[in-house]
Amino acid sequence: MEILLYAVGIILMAIAIAVSIALHEVGHLVPAKLFNVRVPQYMIGFGKTVFSFRRGETEYGFKAIPLGGYISMIGMYPPSPAEVKEHHEEGHSGSTSPFASLAEEARAADAERLQPGDEDRLFYKLPVLKRMVIMLGGPTMNLLIGVVCTAVLICGFGTAQVTNKVSAVSECVPSVSVTHDSISYGECTDKSTPSPAKAAGVQVGDRVVAVNGASTGSWEAVSSAIRAAGSRPSTLTVERNGQRLDLSVTPVEMIRPVSDGKGQYARAADGSIATTRGGFVGVSPSSELVPGSITEVPAMVGDTLSRVGSSMLSLPQRVWELTVTLVTGGERSAESPVSVVGVSRIAGEVTATDRIDVKAKAAMLVSLVANMNLMLFAFNLIPLLPLDGGHVLGAVWEGVRRFFARLTGRKDPGPFDPVKLLPLTYVVAGAFIVMSIILIVADIVKPITLF
């Protein structure tokens, strides 16, 4: 049954990824057709076509490698400058450099798709703003999916809120090991000292209502009171089976990670996990999904995008560190990036675990889809070709050049020519392919696990 549930999670996430890719391309397709650009193909995946059908002038289909998608629009590349044409007309062979050959081949391939009547349906002839709308349509769809999934998560399932109910009682006082990126606790042995909570008789299911007579309205208040007590004897007041009991505990002072209040570890100035010394009792809180308001959605989306942005800035470094980990056999950081394979494995782990109920599993899957789409939104806005952000930047650059040309009375500089950046485009695309291979291999041989 566990294997079946694991497979269900992978299949569900694969469907979610495919739908996200498909809607991303719809975001490009719809405005392109509205602006009368001919779109010969709408494809999900890359490589050999597995299945396709034609409706109107567009072929819709699926390809063998489901790692993305695309729409092809005619007129992506403007013709060569007039002076180059004149140069060829004079009988010269033109540049024989590899880059020039690439440019000529790209223009030739683009020109081969032209049909009679396409003269006014070319992408590069559109006004700058319309081209920007087309290229931003895909990322905008991912943003909308992320916002909708976040709204479903907050208003439908609710977000995890820590309660005062005890979910676990430590058997012993563990040893603590803190590294730059992780914190681990030693295993209990026969020689380990029983935890203060275990010695005091605290049980799973107890609700902590007061510490040393002071009411605790939140688990943060419980933790603060225990940390403040240090190693001094304290009284925990708990509710158990409708009755209140006073339990005497003596906290043990030990190193503790500092929480950022959002379920993550706070960070020190050097980026390491921040720690402090405080009292340890040995109880862990439970969490419940508490539905929120639609007004909470913008803040959560903004927070997610902020974290995605910070993560993207350090992406090259983290991919390099992951590569070193793969080569040296070290331990993979839980904060390392993952591929679609890793996301699917995490989804399978969520559906297969018996540690959370069905509602919590569904909420985690929706959260995965939301975060994935918000990441795709931000990633596609990187201002490098062949990403959407690169095309947007090119359109903006064209608009700026033409504006200043009109302002100064100079000749129109013409449309932005992405062919001139083909070498850079291939380098960027190659880097993305290498990164994807590294992440996929890591997700297979050193997967991140949640449970």
Can you annotate each of these PLM segments?
Residues D118-L126, S170-P174, S184, R256-F377, ...:
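Functional transmembrane alpha-helices
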